[in-house]
C-alpha cells in the first residue's frame, strides 16, 4: 500500500501545473479556463464545463459551452443571430438588419434593437440599367422594367424583349410589329393605312390596303397598266406590249413597247421563190399589225399558211431534209406569233376556222390552279391552269391549239426516231431486229402552246385527244371517219411529236408521250412536254431472215438459170430465129431486173434520194420491157397461126424498137408527170401516192389481157385446123406446141406479178413469200421450158458434152445424126421450136 502511494506522488510531480501548495492553501494544478477552490480542488470558469463540477485531478479539462446550440437557452430576439464566443456568446443583427442603438452586439432579447436596412436607398446602383431595386426584409431584389428581361448570365442585368419575334404582341394581322427598346408598336405596312377611326401605332391599330391605282398614287409608265396588289401595286405591260430589253415586267419601273413579229426568213441555204414570197407576206403583216387588230392578224397569218400548204410550188421539189427543216421553222414561228397575238385578245375563249379547215382555239384567263378543258373539232386538251401560267409572265395565262390538216408536202417521208428503250422492247416482242419504220399520219398536226415557251418538262402532264382523219393516200385528209383505226400485224398506234433535228431538219419522236386508249375515232395521249403532235400508225420493218435467205438463194439460182438461157439462145444455132430473139431479150430483161432487185431494192436510211429513185426507175423499165417482149411473143404466135399464110412476122429491128422503146416511153412520161413517184422510204419501188403504181400496173394488165386474147384466138384457130384434113398437120403440131409454151410462160410471169403488185403492202407477208418463191422460179422455169424441153437444144448440149469428153465420140455421134438433123433443119422454119 505504501508503494502505490509513493508511485502516484511521483507521477503528480511530473505533471504540468503541479506545484507545491502555496502558503494560502490553493491548488496550483487547475486546468485552463478553471479557478482554484482549495488546495485539492478546482472549478471551471463560467461559460465552460467539465466532466464533474469539481475538478480533483489535473487530467480533467474545461470545455467551452455553446450557448447558441439548439436547444438554446439564449433568446436574442427577432432579426438577430446568436454567435458563440470563448466562454460566452453575443447576439448580433442578421444580415440586412442593423441595431438602432448603434451597439454591435447584445446579450438578450431585451437589448435587441435590430431593424431592416434599406439597401436600395443605401446603394441606388445595385440594379443595373433597365432594372429597379426593390427592398425586402433583410435583403433586396432587382426587377426589370416592362419590355425587358434578365439575361441568363446575370440576374441583375436586363435586356430588351423583342415582342415582335417572341409572339408577345397583340398586333392585328393587317399591321406590322415594330420593336422599340422596352416596347413595340403596331404600325401599318407600306401600302396600307389605318382604317377610319383607328390610330397608327398602338396595339389596337387595324389597317387596310391602299389602292394606289385608283387613288393616283402610283408611278406607272404610260405604256403599262397599274394593278393593285395587297400592300403595293405593279406596272404591267398593256395587252399586246412587251417589256423593253433588260427591263422586267410587273415592276414599278416597268417600261413597255409594242410587240412585233420575229423576222421570218427561209432557212439558211434554202432557195425557194414560193417560200420567200410567203415570208415576205408574213413580214408585211407584222409591220402593219396593231394590238387592236390582233384577231384580224391571226386570221391573215392562218390564211397565208393555208395558201402555202395548198400550193407549195417549188417547195415540193426540195429534198426531204430541207422540207422537214421548213416544217420545223414554220411550226415554231406559228407558235410564237399565236402566243404574242393571243395576249392582245380579250379574256375568254377564242376560235377561228379557216376555209381550209385549219383551226385555232385559244383560252385566255387569269392565273389559277384548276383543271381546264378546251377543245375543237380535231383535238381536245385537259391541263392544270397553273401549268399554263408559268412563272415568267404575270399577266393572264394563255393556252392554244393550232390544228393544221394539210401538211402532207412538208412532212412527207418523215422518219420516226426510236429511242434505245423502245427499240429494245420491239426487238424483244418480235424476236428480231427492227430495220425501219413506215409511218402513216392519222390526224392533223396539232401545235400546242402556252403563255410561256418553257414547256420541255412540265410540272404535271397534259391529256390530249386527237381525232382521226380520213386518209386515202397515206396522209391525213380532212373528214373524220366513222370507224376506229385498228393496228394490224407489226403495227402500233403512236402519239408522236415533231422534234427539231440538225441532220434531217426534223423527225417524229415519242419520248415523254404515251397512248392511253383509242375509241370513237380518236386517240387519247398523255405527254409531259409540249410540241406539235400527231397520231401515227407505225408499221415496223422487222427483219425476216427466212425471207431474206429465200430471196438471196432463190434469185441467185434464177440469175444462174437466166444466164444459161441467154448463153443457149446466143450459141445454139438450130433454134435461131425471131422467137428465139424474143426469148433472148426477155431473159436479158429479167436478168438485169433481178440483179438490180437483189442489189438495190432496200432503201437504207428511209430517205428517198437519187440512188433510190434511179433503182426504182430501172426496175420499172426492166420489168415493163420483160412484159413487152412477152407481148411480142404473143404477136409472133398471131402471125404464125392466125396469119400463117401471110408473111413471116416482125423483123428484129421492129422487135427491138417495140420491146425497148415502148417501156422507155412509159417510164419517161411517168417520170415527167410525177418524178417523186419513184422510191419509197422502205423500198426503192413505185410509190402508191396519186395512183402512180398504175404506170406499171396499167401496161402490165393491158399486156396480159392482150396476150390472153391472142392465145384464146390461137387455140380456137388451131382447133379449127385440127378438125380439118390439113396437109400442113406437122406445122400445126409445132404451132400447138409453141402456143402451149407461150401460155405456160404467160401464166408463170403473170401470176408472179399479180402477187408482186402487192408485195409492198404493210400486211402482205404471205404475198411476199409467194412472190419471192415464184420470182425465184422464173429463171428455172424459163430454162426448163425453152432449153431442157427443147429437143434441138438437148442435141446441142449432147454435142457440146461429147466435144468436151473427146473428139472420137463426137465424130461418131455427128455421123449417125447428121442425116436426120439436116432433114429436120430443112423441114422447119428458122423460127420454129423443136419440142
Curated annotation (Swiss-Prot):
Residues 21-552, 602-620, 675-691, 761-766 are extracellular. Broadly expressed, found on most hematopoietic cells, including activated lymphocytes, monocytes, macrophages, dendritic cells, and granulocytes. Expressed also abundantly by smooth muscle cells. Expressed in thyroid, colorectal, gastric, esophageal and pancreatic carcinomas too. Expression are increased under inflammatory conditions in the CNS of multiple sclerosis and in synovial tissue of patients with rheumatoid arthritis. Increased expression of CD97 in the synovium is accompanied by detectable levels of soluble CD97 in the synovial fluid. GO terms for molecular function: calcium ion binding; G protein-coupled receptor activity; transmembrane signaling receptor activity. Glycans are attached at residues 33, 38, 108, 203, 371, 406, 413, 453, 520. It comes from the Eukaryota. Residues 814-835 are annotated as: Disordered. Residues 1-20 form the signal peptide. Residues 495-543 are annotated as: GPS. Residues 814-826 have a biased composition (Polar residues). The first two EGF domains mediate the interaction with DAF. A third tandemly arranged EGF domain is necessary for the structural integrity of the binding region. Forms a heterodimer, consisting of a large extracellular region (alpha subunit) non-covalently linked to a seven-transmembrane moiety (beta subunit). Interacts with complement decay-accelerating factor (DAF). The largest isoform (isoform 1) interacts with chondroitin sulfate. Receptor potentially involved in both adhesion and signaling processes early after leukocyte activation. Plays an essential role in leukocyte migration. This is Adhesion G protein-coupled receptor E5. It comes from Homo sapiens. The lineage of its organism: Eukaryota, Metazoa, Chordata, Craniata, Vertebrata. The gene is ADGRE5.
Amino acid at each position: 500500500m505504501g508503494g502505490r502511494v509513493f508511485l502516484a506522488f511521483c507521477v503528480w510531480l511530473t505533471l504540468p501545473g503541479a506545484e507545491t501548495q502555496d502558503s494560502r492553501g490553493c491548488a496550483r494544478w487547475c486546468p485552463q479556463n478553471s479557478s482554484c477552490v482549495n488546495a485539492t480542488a478546482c472549478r471551471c470558469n463560467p461559460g465552460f464545463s467539465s466532466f464533474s463540477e469539481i475538478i480533483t485531478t489535473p487530467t480533467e479539462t474545461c470545455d467551452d459551452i455553446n450557448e447558441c446550440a439548439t436547444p438554446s437557452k439564449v433568446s436574442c430576439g427577432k432579426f438577430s443571430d446568436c454567435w458563440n464566443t470563448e466562454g460566452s456568446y453575443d447576439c448580433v443583427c442578421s444580415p440586412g438588419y442593423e441595431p438602432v442603438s448603434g451597439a454591435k452586439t447584445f446579450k438578450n432579447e431585451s437589448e435587441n434593437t435590430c431593424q431592416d436596412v434599406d439597401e436600395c436607398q443605401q446603394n441606388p446602383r445595385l440594379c443595373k440599367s433597365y432594372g429597379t431595386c426593390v427592398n425586402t426584409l433583410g435583403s433586396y431584389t432587382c426587377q426589370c422594367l416592362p419590355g425587358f428581361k434578365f439575361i441568363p448570365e446575370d440576374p441583375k442585368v436586363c435586356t430588351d424583349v423583342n415582342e415582335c419575334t417572341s409572339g408577345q404582341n397583340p398586333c392585328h394581322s393587317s399591321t406590322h410589329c415594330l420593336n422599340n427598346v422596352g416596347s413595340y408598336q403596331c404600325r401599318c405596312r407600306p401600302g396600307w393605312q389605318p382604317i377610319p377611326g383607328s390610330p397608327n401605332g398602338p396595339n389596337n391599330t387595324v389597317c387596310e390596303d391602299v389602292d394606289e391605282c385608283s387613288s393616283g398614287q402610283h408611278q406607272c409608265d404610260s405604256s403599262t397598266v397599274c394593278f393593285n396588289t395587297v400592300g403595293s401595286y405593279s406596272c404591267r405591260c398593256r395587252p399586246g406590249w412587251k417589256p423593253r430589253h433588260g427591263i422586267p415586267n410587273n415592276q414599278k419601273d416597268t417600261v413597255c413597247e409594242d410587240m412585233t413579229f420575229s423576222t421570218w426568213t427561209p432557212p439558211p441555204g434554202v432557195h425557194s421563190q414560193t417560200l420567200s414570197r410567203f415570208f415576205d407576206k408574213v413580214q408585211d403583216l407584222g409591220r402593219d399589225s396593231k394590238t387592236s387588230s390582233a384577231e384580224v392578224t391571226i386570221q391573215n397569218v392562218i390564211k397565208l399558211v393555208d395558201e402555202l400548204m395548198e400550193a407549195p410550188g417549188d417547195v415540193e421539189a426540195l429534198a426531204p431534209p430541207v422540207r422537214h427543216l421548213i416544217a420545223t421553222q414554220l411550226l415554231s414561228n406559228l407558235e410564237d406569233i399565236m402566243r404574242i397575238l393571243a395576249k392582245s385578245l380579250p379574256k375568254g375563249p377564242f376560235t377561228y376556222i379557216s376555209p381550209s379547215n385549219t383551226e385555232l382555239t385559244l383560252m385566255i384567263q387569269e392565273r389559277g390552279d384548276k383543271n381546264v378543258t378546251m377543245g375543237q373539232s380535231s383535238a381536245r386538251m385537259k391541263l392544270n391552269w397553273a401549268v399554263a401560267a408559268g412563272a415568267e409572265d404575270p399577266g393572264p395565262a394563255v393556252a392554244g391549239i393550232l390544228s393544221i390538216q394539210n401538211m402532207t408536202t412538208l412532212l412527207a417521208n418523215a422518219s420516226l426516231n426510236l429511242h434505245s428503250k423502245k427499240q429494245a422492247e420491239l426487238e424483244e416482242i418480235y424476236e428480231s431486229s427492227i430495220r425501219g419504220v413506215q409511218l402513216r399520219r392519222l390526224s392533223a398536226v396539232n401545235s400546242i402552246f402556252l403563255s410561256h415557251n418553257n414547256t420541255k418538262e412540265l410540272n404535271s402532264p397534259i391529256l390530249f385527244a386527237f381525232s382521226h382523219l380520213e386518209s386515202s393516200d397515206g396522209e391525213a385528209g380532212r373528214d373524220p371517219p366513222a370507224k376506229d383505226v385498228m393496228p394490224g400485224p407489226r403495227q402500233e398506234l403512236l402519239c408522236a411529236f415533231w422534234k427539231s433535228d440538225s441532220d434531217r431538219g426534223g423527225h417524229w419522236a415519242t419520248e415523254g408521250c404515251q397512248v392511253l386508249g383509242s375509241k370513237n375515232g380518236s386517240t387519247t395521249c398523255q405527254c409531259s412536254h409540249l410540241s406539235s403532235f400527231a397520231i401515227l400508225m407505225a408499221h415496223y420493218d422487222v427483219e425476216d431472215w427466212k425471207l431474206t435467205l429465200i430471196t438471196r438463194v432463190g434469185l441467185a439460182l434464177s440469175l444462174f438459170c437466166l444466164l444459161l438461157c441467154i448463153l443457149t439462145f446466143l450459141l445454139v444455132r438450130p433454134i435461131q430465129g425471131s422467137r428465139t430473139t424474143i426469148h433472148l431479150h426477155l431473159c436479158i430483161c429479167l436478168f438485169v431486173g433481178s440483179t438490180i432487185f437483189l442489189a438495190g431494192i432496200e432503201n437504207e436510211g428511209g430517205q428517198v434520194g437519187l440512188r433510190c429513185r434511179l433503182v426504182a426507175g430501172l426496175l420499172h423499165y426492166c420489168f415493163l420491157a420483160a412484159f413487152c417482149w412477152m407481148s411480142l411473143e404473143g404477136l409472133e404466135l398471131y402471125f404464125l397461126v392466125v396469119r400463117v399464110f401471110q408473111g413471116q412476122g416482125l423483123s428484129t429491128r421492129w422487135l427491138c424498137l417495140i420491146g425497148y422503146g415502148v417501156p422507155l416511153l412509159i417510164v419517161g412520161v411517168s417520170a415527167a408527170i410525177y418524178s417523186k413517184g419513184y422510191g419509197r422510204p422502205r423500198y426503192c419501188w413505185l410509190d402508191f401516192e396519186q395512183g402512180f403504181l398504175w404506170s406499171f400496173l396499167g401496161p402490165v394488165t393491158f399486156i396480159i389481157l392482150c396476150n390472153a386474147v391472142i392465145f384464146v384466138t390461137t387455140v380456137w384457130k388451131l382447133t379449127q385446123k385440127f378438125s380439118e384434113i390439113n396437109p400442113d398437120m406437122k406445122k400445126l403440131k409445132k404451132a400447138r406446141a409453141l402456143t402451149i409454151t407461150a401460155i405456160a410462160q404467160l401464166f408463170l410471169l403473170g401470176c408472179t406479178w399479180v402477187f408482186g403488185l402487192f408485195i409492198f403492202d404493210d400486211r402482205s407477208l404471205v404475198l411476199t413469200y409467194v412472190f419471192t418463191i415464184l420470182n425465184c422460179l422464173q429463171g428455172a422455169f424459163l430454162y426448163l421450158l425453152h432449153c431442157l424441153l427443147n429437143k434441138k437444144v438437148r442435141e446441142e448440149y449432147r454435142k457440146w458434152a461429147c466435144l468436151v469428153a473427146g473428139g472420137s465420140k463426137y465424130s461418131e455421134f455427128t455421123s449417125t445424126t447428121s442425116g436426120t438433123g439436116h432433114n429436120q433443119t430443112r423441114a422447119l422454119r428458122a423460127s420454129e421450136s423443136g419440142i
